[in-house]
Amino acid sequence: MSKILVAGNPDYGLSKAIKFLYPDATFVSRTHGNLDLSIPSKQRELAELSMDYDIFIAVSCIWRFAQTEYVQEVAKRWIERKHGYIIAIGSSADTPVKGTAWMYPAEKKALRSYCRQLSQISAGEND
């Protein structure tokens, strides 16, 4: 059985649905595990913790591009050690249909772009 780590609050939204499907998964957030993932030192702590798991799911979206930053921290370690699977939850908001000053679409677009880069590594396109 795979060990799953989820960055997200299991009492809310998509993380709650993941908890229903995978009740043995471990969840971390400000309220679960005392990890405020907007703080770089906590992102590094998450990355180290993730090494004990086979699958990492990034659900928690935190302002100022923190979701992309904490996915990067996890990915750096996992790439170095050829470890597991990363699933990052994006949003259709990354392709807005009208102009907006809201940063959320830009943050999700950055996450999508970063994850595409990661997929090229896993596909061996850098060899």
Regions found by a protein language model. Give the residues of each.
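Canonical Rossmann dinucleotide-binding motif of NAD(H)/NADP(H)-dependent dehydrogenases/reductases
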Residues: 1-28
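A short helix-coil junction within the Rossmann-fold of NAD(P)-dependent oxidoreductases
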Residues: 66, 73-82
